[in-house]
Structure formats: structure tokens, C-alpha cells
From Swiss-Prot:
Residues 777-797 are annotated as: Disordered. The chain crosses the membrane at residues 691-711. Residues 786-797 have a biased composition (Polar residues). This is Protocadherin beta-9. It comes from Homo sapiens. Keywords: Calcium, Cell adhesion, Cell membrane, Glycoprotein, Membrane, Repeat, Signal, Transmembrane, Transmembrane helix.
Length: 797
């Protein structure tokens, strides 16, 4: 705590005046208890639960504690039994000194609701001290002409006990000159006086020695003794006379050591040695002797140690003036100590909580008491906390204050507060005391976990390995401790047909997502599901986020040739007139790929040919065209192998085998021979040759000119429709994917049947060209491309 000068703050303030016995007693109750001093530690005082009318266990449930005014733990409360016990041996003389009765004031504090019960404990005295004289020997100088009945006041004995246990009587040893008289004082103390019964004669006896005994009233009684030595003097006519019987003065408590407090003066009408006056303290207490000193020759009283108004606010000192002849006189000096603002306010914490739960307004954080040992304006105080904090001070009885939360706290906004309680007095100069409290705001589960994204998009390539980590979700919770520990889970899918539990799993601790099985892009391209994040608070709070998984296509499907059919049946043979010009469309290889994207981009390449250089394949559409003019030297039958390759990594491929037959004209019937039976094929071929030869001879003469002209005229007009075989119109096989615009053939690109193979009867059909069903929007482009064939073929040889 700090003590320093003060400038008045413009903040929340609580002004109150410290009175000697405190402030209002309203509504707090008051208990009076007692205990005998010097009882052992743990001695029973009272059962507070019964005395306050509380149920068993209520003291413990309400956090009851006992605090004393001086912040010392003289008492101990057993909150389970309700017994109030002594925490140490109590010495009444140390606690209260000469003050009687000896009271210890304390408070009983309880929470829920907050209450203060005020109480006092009286420490009863026992006779544990004997009377003690400060001087073991007292010297009295008495003139021989002193009249009988003259009383001489003696030094009294000291006994720290009080009441009946204090000094009750004085006695003197047996003698024929003196007896003891007991006198009282305004303070209630008794003094011994030595009364002269018989005139003294110095010539008979110069000195006498007596024993003074002090007796207390305890049972058994205790006593103390001192020796009185009486010196008989010659005649001394005059007694010293003080200028004043009572001297009154004031001394500020901050007066420095050595300061002159007051000067007393006494005169003596005698002359010589009998007129020499000396000054001394008479029957002074130990406190007076340690605080002041007197000059025996001048009568000046000086300060020997610093004054403390809070300990002693006034002193009454008896001064004795004695002349050289042994005669003395006494006066009284009354010193009033003036208070100065030399004590900063004291802040005594009775109850303190260093932690408070957030969202808890009106919670008691601390209970403390303010004391200022000064008086008047110096004892008035102002108490406040910082104005920018959500806390306030509530005054209570007996200068107690309660520090409370003003509103609900939010740990996520601020988890720790440094509160400074400042107490300032109104003295000059102003002094203040500061007490700092560090308050931790404990967490309440008032924040749900929050995902870093409202939705997540994850990519996973098909044919993945099971238990593959495909991604993660993450959520944070602004709370702390277990309230911030997040657990992840999969929420039931909105689509009841989605087998989510067999597709993915989530790690409950870190939000990692795993694919449980291998995914197939061709079966499932994407799926959505929700994940939840919940904390471990009570009650638990949760949130959710959307996760979309996109399956990336892998090149796991080879191209599939739709035309010509590669199913092992008799091949379809393409007929090409020998009069065909370069770029003549022989046929088109049609293939599809079950993959997507570039994995389904197909390219075509002539892998093998009976006569290289005669035919070419367009790389992007699979069209097979003639590469040059045909001649009579070219073989009639050709076998082409076309490679269809996709654009995946690594690429996949398939091959298509084509059979091409070169013919002179389309009026001649032709039936392809099955390769499966070579002998039968030779017979069929011989029959065909005979028929053709017979027809040729019969019609050679009549039709040679007409046929020649007709063939030449029709060759160009019918070139696009000659030699095409059909693929049955209908849907693709179920295991294939219809891909448009990826380089494969449109479904509407069809051929009619031109020939059938595998017939043993030699049946055949003449070629019947039809118009292809092409999409309207590509018609112009197709015509344009075909029109440029003679100039740029783009063949792939």
C-alpha cells in the first residue's frame, strides 16, 4: 500500500466519517460474549449457529467468517459445528492495558445474501500480576519542626490487573512516628500518604527506615513492597511555591524530539541552600518517563520521543519542586496532544475472491473495512475504484464496504481485471492508500463453436485407397478449458438415400475427414453432407457446416468402339469404288469413353494397313478417307487397324479393325466371305465370280457404253453415301457414358445396313444410301469441311 499526497479525483466516491465507535447499527444485530484471559487455545466461547438462530450447516453453506477490527485472528470459527473458539491465549493486559472493561470487537460475515453481524468479546481479568513499586527505595527528607498530622504523598505501586485484582490497600511497617492513609484520585486510583504522628527530633534519630506494602484484592492476594528511607533535617521555614498549581499546554503530535513543551517555575522564600529548588516528576508512569524529560534546575519539560495522538491524546504529569532543606511542593501539568494528519487510511480486507464467473452481475468480490486513526477532518475518507471498470462499491455498517460487479462480465472480451481501491482522507496534506486486486473472470459456456468456413469443398480423385484423408474441417470456441474443447461429428444426411456412413468418417478430436471406400466418379460425381462441432460445456453448445465432396475423374476407362462392332461376329466390309478421288469418306470409327474431361478426349490413328499410304484417319473425328487416287494395281481387299486413344494420364487406348473392298461399280453384287471358314469362303467366292462373269459377258456389249457414262456421272454425286454399314439405332450400352462434344460420335450419326456377313446362302443387299441425321446447327460446318476435303485432308497415316 502506498501513502502519499493527494489531489481530489473526479470519480465515483463514497464519503464517510470515522467515528470512535463506528456508524449505524441498523439491521446488523449485536452479540456480546466473554472469555477469561489466559485460557488455552481452542477454548469454547459460544455456538454461533444457535446464537444466531441458523440451521445446522448454514454457516458453512454461506461462507461464514469472523474478522476483527484490527485484522488479527483472535477467534476461530468451526463453520461445520458452529462453535466459536479462541485462536490463541488472550492476555488482557497486552490487549487492553489499563482499560476496563477489555473489549475485542469483531464481525461475523455471511454471503448469499451478504450480512454482517457485529459482536464483542469481553476478556475477563484474572489475578496474574503482583503489585510492583517502580523504586525499591523512596527517600523522604522531613524537617524536624514538621507539625504532627502532616501528610506526605508516596509513590503508588503499579498492578496491570484491573478491578478487584488491582491494588486495594497499602500498609506500613510498625513504627511510632508514622501511619498510612489511603487517598483516591480523579482517575479512580488510590495513593498512599505517610502521616506524621509524632514530632521528629534530629538529635535523637537522624534517619528512619520503613517498609511500604501494596496489596491487591485477588484471591489469593498478591503484594509488593518498597523501602521508605526518612532523613530528618534541621529547621527549614519556607516551602517552595509554584507560580501555578495547574499548567495546561498543547503539543502537536508531529512535534520533533527535543521540543520544549512547557516550563514550570517555583520559588522559595528561604535563603542559601534552603532556597535552591530542584524539579522532578512525581509518581510518574512509565509512559510519561519515556515520553518526557524535565530539567531539574530550570523546570523545562522537553519531548523525549514522538507523540502519537492515536495512542495517547493527553498527559497528566505531577511535578515536584524540592528546596535544599527537603521541603517540597507539587503542581500538575496537563498536556493535550493535537492530532495531525500523519496516518493514511487503512484498508482491511475481510473477504476476497480472485475469480468470478462471467455473466454474473451483482456478485460480491470483496468485503473490506476502512479505518483512519486520525480524527476530525483528518479521519474523514473518500473511497472509490476506477470509473472505467464494471464494478462499484456499496457501503455497509461499521465502515465496511462491499466490492460488487456492476453488470455481467464477458471473459471473451476481457479475462482479467486489475482493480485499484483508493481510500483518501480529507486532512492536510491529504493521504491515500491504494489496494490492488487482480480478478480473473472464469469461463461460462456461452459461446458455441464456430467453423472457420460456413461451407467446405473437398476434392478427391476416384479410385482412392480406403481410409484416405480427404480434408479437414476446423471450428474454434471462444470459451476456455473444457468449454472450448470441440468434438466433431457427422450429422444425418438430408438425402435419405445417401449412404454417408459408408462413404466418409470424421475424427472427433481434430475434424479430419476420411474416405471409407474407393469412390467411382462414373457412379457418384459429388455429394453433400453436414458436420457438427459441439463443445464439452454444460449444457453443450454446437454448430454445423456444409461439406461438399467433388469426385475427380481418373482415367480408368479405355475408349470403347461403337462402330465398327468388335464383338467377334463377321466384320462389316466397307465398299469403295475404284474411281474414288483423294479424301473420299470410306467410313467413320465411332468410339466413346466413360471418363470425363480430357480423359474422354479421343484421338484416332491408323495403326496398321494392308497397303500403307492408301487410306488415312482424321485424328479428331475418326473419319477414314482415301489418301490418293485408286488404281487397278491396288489390291481389292484391305484390312485397316485404327488406334483410338484418350487424352488421360497415362492414356488408354482401344483398336478397331476395318475391312475395305475396292469395287469398280455398285451394280455388282458382293458378299463378304467369312474368315472363320476358309474352304467355304473359296466356294462362295467362286460362285460370285461365275455370276459376275456371266452377267458381264451378257451385258458387256449392250451396256458397256451406258454403264461407263452412268458410273462417271454418279461417281461424285453418290460418293458420300457409298459403302456404309449401319449401327442399330438405340441407347448405348449401360456401362458407357454418352459424351457430347468431346470428339466422339453423336448418337444421331447413323448408317443403314449395307451388307450382312456370315450368311451361307449368298444373300445380299445392294447399297442404299440415306441422308445422315446431323444436328441442324452443325450442318453448315459439316458441309463446309467436306467441301474442302480435296485440298486439306488432315489424314493420320
Amino acid at each position: 500500500m502506498k501513502t502519499r499526497g493527494f489531489s481530489f479525483p473526479r470519480q465515483r466516491q463514497v464519503l464517510f466519517l470515522f467515528l470512535f465507535w463506528g456508524v449505524s447499527l441498523a439491521g446488523s444485530g449485536f452479540g456480546r460474549y466473554s472469555v477469561t484471559e489466559e485460557t488455552e487455545k481452542g477454548s469454547f466461547v459460544v455456538n454461533l449457529a444457535k446464537d444466531l438462530g441458523l440451521a445446522e450447516g448454514e454457516l458453512a453453506a454461506r461462507g461464514t467468517r469472523v474478522v476483527s477490527d484490527d485484522n488479527k485472528q483472535y477467534l476461530l470459527l468451526d463453520s461445520h459445528t458452529g462453535n466459536l473458539l479462541t485462536n490463541e491465549k488472550l492476555d488482557r493486559e497486552k490487549l487492553c492495558g489499563p482499560k476496563e472493561p477489555c473489549m475485542l470487537y469483531f464481525q461475523i460475515l455471511m454471503d448469499d445474501p451478504f450480512q454482517i453481524y457485529r459482536a464483542e468479546l469481553r476478556v475477563r481479568d484474572i489475578n496474574d500480576h503482583s503489585p510492583v513499586f517502580r523504586h525499591k527505595e523512596m527517600v523522604l527528607k522531613i524537617s524536624e519542626n514538621t507539625a504532627e498530622g502532616t501528610a506526605f504523598r508516596l509513590e503508588r505501586a503499579q498492578d496491570p490487573d484491573e478491578g478487584h485484582n488491582s491494588i486495594q490497600n497499602y500498609t506500613i511497617s510498625s513504627n511510632s512516628f508514622f501511619h498510612i492513609k489511603i487517598s483516591g484520585s480523579d482517575e479512580g486510583m488510590i495513593y498512599p500518604e505517610l502521616v506524621l504522628d509524632k514530632a521528629l527530633d534530629r538529635e535523637e534519630q537522624e534517619e528512619l527506615s520503613l517498609t511500604l506494602t501494596a496489596l491487591d484484592g485477588g484471591s489469593p492476594s498478591r503484594s509488593g513492597t518498597s523501602t521508605i528511607r526518612i532523613v530528618v533535617l534541621d529547621v527549614n521555614d519556607n516551602v517552595p511555591q509554584f507560580a501555578q498549581a495547574l499548567y495546561e499546554t498543547q503539543a502537536p503530535e508531529n512535534s520533533p524530539v527535543g521540543s520544549l513543551i512547557v516550563k514550570v517555575s517555583a520559588g522559595d522564600a528561604d535563603s542559601g541552600v534552603n532556597a535552591e529548588v530542584s524539579y522532578s516528576f512525581f509518581d510518574a508512569s512509565e509512559d510519561i518517563l519515556t515520553t518526557f524529560q524535565i530539567n531539574p534546575f530550570s523546570g523545562e519539560i522537553f519531548l523525549r520521543e514522538l507523540l502519537d495522538y492515536e495512542l495517547v491524546n493527553s498527559y497528566k504529569i505531577n511535578i515536584q519542586a524540592m528546596d535544599g532543606g527537603g521541603l517540597s511542593a507539587r503542581c500538575t501539568v496537563l498536556i493535550k496532544v493535537l492530532d495531525s494528519n500523519d496516518n493514511p487510511p487503512e484498508l482491511i480486507i475481510s473477504s476476497l475472491s480472485n475469480s468470478v464467473a462471467e455473466n454474473s452481475p451483482g456478485i460480491v468480490l470483496a468485503v473490506f473495512k476502512i479505518k483512519d486513526r486520525d480524527s476530525g477532518e483528518n479521519g474523514k475518507t473518500i473511497c472509490y475504484v476506477q470509473d472505467n471498470l464494471p464494478f462499484f462499491l456499496k457501503p455497509s455498517v461499521d465502515n465496511f464496504y462491499i466490492l460488487m460487479t456492476e453488470g455481467a462480465l464477458d471473459r471473451e472480451s476481457k479475462a482479467e481485471y486489475n482493480i485499484t481501491i483508493t481510500v483518501t482522507d480529507l486532512g492536510t496534506p491529504r493521504l491515500k492508500t491504494e489496494h490492488s486486486i487482480t480478478l480473473q473472470v472464469s469461463d461460462v459456456n456461452d459461446n458455441a463453436p464456430a467453423f472457420t468456413q460456413t461451407s467446405y469443398t473437398l476434392f478427391v480423385r476416384e479410385n482412392n485407397s480406403p481410409a484416405l484423408h480427404i480434408g479437414s474441417v476446423s471450428a474454434t470456441d471462444r470459451d476456455s478449458g473444457t468449454n472450448a474443447q470441440v468434438t466433431y461429428s457427422l450429422l444425418p444426411p438430408q438425402d435419405p438415400h445417401l449412404p454417408l456412413a459408408s462413404l466418409v468418417s470424421i475424427n472427433a478430436d481434430n475434424g479430419h475427414l476420411f474416405a471409407l471406400r474407393s469412390l467411382d466418379y462414373e457412379a457418384l460425381q459429388a455429394f453433400d453432407f453436414r458436420v457438427g462441432a459441439s463443445d464439452r460445456g454444460s449444457p453443450a453448445l454446437s454448430s454445423e457446416a456444409l461439406v461438399r465432396v467433388l469426385v475427380l475423374d481418373a482415367n480408368d476407362n479405355s475408349p470403347f468402339v461403337l462402330y465398327p462392332l468388335q464383338n467377334g461376329s463377321a466384320p462389316c466390309t466397307e465398299l469403295v469404288p475404284r474411281a474414288a478421288e483423294p479424301g473420299y469418306l470410306v467410313t467413320k470409327v465411332v468410339a466413346v469413353d466413360g471418363d470425363s474431361g480430357q480423359n474422354a478426349w479421343l484421338s484416332y490413328q491408323l495403326l496398321k494397313a494392308t497397303e500403307p499410304g492408301l487410306f488415312g484417319v482424321w485424328a479428331h473425328n475418326g473419319e477414314v478417307r482415301t489418301a490418293r487416287l485408286l488404281s487397278e494395281r491396288d489390291a481389292a481387299k484391305h484390312r485397316l487397324v485404327v488406334l483410338v486413344k484418350d487424352n488421360g494420364e497415362p492414356p488408354r487406348s482401344a483398336t478397331a479393325t476395318l475391312h475395305v473392298l475396292l469395287v469398280d461399280g455398285f451394280s455388282q453384287p458382293y458378299l463378304p466371305l467369312p474368315e472363320a471358314a476358309p474352304a467355304q469362303a473359296q466356294a462362295d467366292l467362286l460362285t460370285v465370280y461365275l455370276v459376275v462373269a456371266l452377267a458381264s459377258v451378257s451385258s458387256l456389249f449392250l451396256l458397256s457404253v451406258l454403264l461407263f457414262v452412268a458410273v462417271r456421272l454418279c461417281r461424285r454425286s453418290r460418293a458420300a453415301s457409298v459403302g456404309r454399314c449401319s449401327v442399330p439405332e438405340g441407347p448405348f450400352p449401360g456401362h458407357l457414358v454418352d459424351v457430347s462434344g468431346t470428339g466422339t460420335l453423336f448418337q444421331s450419326y447413323q448408317y443403314e445396313v449395307c451388307l450382312t456377313g456370315g450368311s451361307e446362302t449368298g444373300e445380299f443387299k445392294f447399297l442404299k444410301p440415306i441422308t445422315p441425321h446431323l444436328p441442324p446447327h452443325r450442318g453448315g460446318k459439316e458441309i463446309e469441311e467436306n467441301s474442302t476435303l480435296p485440298n486439306s485432308f488432315g489424314f493420320n497415316y
